[in-house]
Amino acid sequence: MLARRPRDPLQALRRRGQELKLQVDSLVTESQLTGALEPSKRREIYQRCIQLKQAVDENKNTLQKLNKADEAAPVGNYEQRKEEEHSLLEKLACQLQELAVSISRKDALKVEAHSDKEEDDTTEDDEEETGGEEEESEGDGEGKQEQASPKQAETETVTYIALGDFAAQQTGDLTFKKGDVLHIIEKKPDGWWLAKDAEGVEGLIPRTYLEPYNKEDKLESSEGSEEGGEEDGEEDVEVVDETADGAQVKQRTDSHWSAVRKAISEQINTVDVLATMGAIPAGFRPSTLSQLLDEAGNQFRASYFLQPELTTSQLAFRDLTWDAKAGTIMSRPSRVSLILTLWSCKMIPLPGTSIQVLSRHIRLCLFDGSKVLSNIHTVRAVWQPKKPKTWTFSPQVTGILPCLLDGDCFIRSNSSTPDLGILFELGISYIRNSTGERGELSCGWVFLKLFDASGVPIPAKTYELFLNGGTPYEKGVEVDPSVSRRAQGSVFRQMISVRRQPQLLVKLRSLNRRSRAMLSLLPETLVGSMCSAHLLIFYRQILGDVLLRDRTNLQSADLISHPVLATFPLLLEQPDVMDALRSSWSEKESTLKRAEKRDKELLKAEFLLVYHDCVLPLLHSTLLPPFRWAEEETEAARWKAIADFLKQSRENEGSLKALLSPDGVHKPFDLSEQTFDFLGEIRKNSG
């Protein structure tokens, strides 16, 4: 028998919230005696703390999904009550997190004290064993010496010199200045070594700031310095050997100082230099998807996938067919057709002050684990100075939301590969303050498979995805190794550090009837913004009219005079002009009557008029600077030029006056503005 749905879900959640509050208050009161409790009791409190935190998070998730329509009877001040409950749950979550951190710190201090005591005991035992060894036979003594020598080599203190200044980032780090001599106590495989300075202060330091120290080399001539450099290179090789066990994916971040010296003579990759200098986390890489966009021409751009594809015989269109009964292009279902919402990115590491971030964004595409199967779609993120590690999407703006900021994306694919999924790559565009050099870095990536091992589509829900460092072709690389480094040695720290890992929140939404019908008019493979999907459909319908309905000879490959078909693909690479078209069409659509909106031919005719009146003048105006990604001044100048043009057109009821004005200067006419060469624009058949 099916369980009955609660009649008052909000009231039930509020009741559950009060129960959780009582449990949290009781746990906090009990924890006040933590200092006098046994370790087993503290562990029990910590486990209860984690369980309560999970229960609070579940309540928060359920609360977010609640709507007023879920209530069986009207509820007064619904939104206010919901907000109050959300605030209570947030407060409880903070209390539990603080309590967990407090307990874990106390345990960590006890573990460290216990370790010191064990080391003292071990020293005494070693002295006793040494005395006993002298009484043993000579052969046994030699055997024990052979066994002890590797251990002695590992714990032997090595002297290094600091190559730069380092300020402690967290408790336990050791602050030092350039030129300080440091004694290495323990070399850890994660790259953070335990060291002691000249004053005897111990702490963790990054090995990328160190170089072996040799007093004789300091007194020798420049020739001796060069020999010292060669010895340093050998030491770098030893470092690689030490970290090779279980850390092979981190090879790109090994021998950092050697890479810097090499960069001076061989001009190695800028990213390696930035990582060596500590300007970026070790897991950052040059953006893979950005390089594909730059180097592959048109192959991974939306304009390429928007064009029709020919059949194997090259005599017809494979994905653009005419529906004579409906009088328009035929809808085409695909294996994957869904809407994806980008919610937020959390705990994204910050780059250093030596580089200026120009843009934070996500690039996404369809991927099978080895190759990209669709266009690469880009969504720009926004952030607040108070929360610089959190990126959000679809901000509230005055007027229409720019399609570049729209976090709602449609995903379509007809690929039959069982490993089909969505590849997300977080990136930043930057400029180096010292050299003015520009570039794009990947801040992490994640691959979400769309089908399980049985070939069943994954459910439509919200996914919390933890990011990987490196490139999509590297495995096991962390975005910021310092996060997991802090979690070593304590189960409690490991559990808390999970929430500090860089992560991406996305939601997969299933389609309703209207959305499915709309997206089925798009190409079988395409990723794009939902806010511009209706404009892409207009283009495909006009493309079908021209290529399938109006051509007298379907075998003719002559050039076609059609400015919309010739120029519309340019809009996909100029999102601000696409926004101008969206705005103009929205204003025009608001003036149409309901009966007119149902007339498809009338809508297409009106769309063509709006396009001619808005887009064509902007594309060929000299007042509009060329589009350049992540150049703030250029983007601002383009926005101003577009806004001024739209304002004039609105005031003069059209763009004719602006076009005929002596102030309006346009580029020389080119035949490509009117000519549509559909064979030149056709996608090559992948089969």
Swiss-Prot record:
It is found in: Cell junction; Cell junction, Adherens junction; Cell projection, Cilium; Cytoplasm, Cytoskeleton, Cilium axoneme. Residues 111-154, 215-237 are annotated as: Disordered. Residues 155-215 form the SH3 domain. Disruption phenotype: Mice are viable without renal manifestations of nephronophthisis. Male mice are infertile with oligoteratozoospermia. Spermatogenesis is blocked at the early stages of spermatid elongation, with degenerating spermatids sloughing off into the lumen. Early elongating spermatids are detached from Sertoli cells and show a failure of sperm head and tail morphogenesis and an abnormal F-actin distribution. Severe retinal degradation with mislocalized rhodopsin, disorganized outer segments, restricted expression of transducin to the inner segment and abnormal intraflagellar transport (IFT) of IFT57. The modification Phosphotyrosine is found at residues 46, 304. SMART domains: SH3. Residues 118-140, 223-237 have a biased composition (Acidic residues). Keywords: Cell junction, Cell projection, Cilium, Cilium biogenesis/degradation, Coiled coil, Cytoplasm, Cytoskeleton, Differentiation, Phosphoprotein, SH3 domain, Spermatogenesis, Tight junction. Expressed in the retina (at protein level). Expressed in the testis (at protein level). Widespread expression, with weak expression in skeletal muscle, kidney, thyroid, ovary, lung, prostate, thymus, uterus, heart, and liver. Lowest levels in brain and spleen. One of its GO terms (biological process) is cell projection organization. InterPro entries: NPHP1 (IPR039687), NPHP1_SH3 (IPR030642), SH3-like_dom_sf (IPR036028), SH3_domain (IPR001452). Together with BCAR1 it may play a role in the control of epithelial cell polarity. Involved in the organization of apical junctions in kidney cells, together with NPHP4 and RPGRIP1L/NPHP8. Does not seem to be strictly required for ciliogenesis. Seems to help to recruit PTK2B/PYK2 to cell matrix adhesions, thereby initiating phosphorylation of PTK2B/PYK2 and PTK2B/PYK2-dependent signaling. May play a role in the regulation of intraflagellar transport (IFT) during cilia assembly. Required for normal retina development. Interacts with INVS and NPHP3. Interacts with Crk-associated substrate BCAR1. Interacts with NPHP4. Interacts with PTK2B/PYK2 and tensin. Interacts with AHI1 and TNK2. Interacts with NPHP4 in a complex containing NPHP1, NPHP4 and RPGRIP1L/NPHP8. Interacts with IQCB1; the interaction likely requires additional interactors. Interacts (via SH3 domain) with PKD1. Interacts with KIF7. Interacts with ANKS3. Interacts with SPATA7. Interacts with FLNA. Belongs to the nephrocystin-1 family. The SH3 domain mediates the stable interaction with Cas and is involved in establishing tight junctions in epithelial cells. This is Nephrocystin-1. It comes from Mus musculus (Mouse).
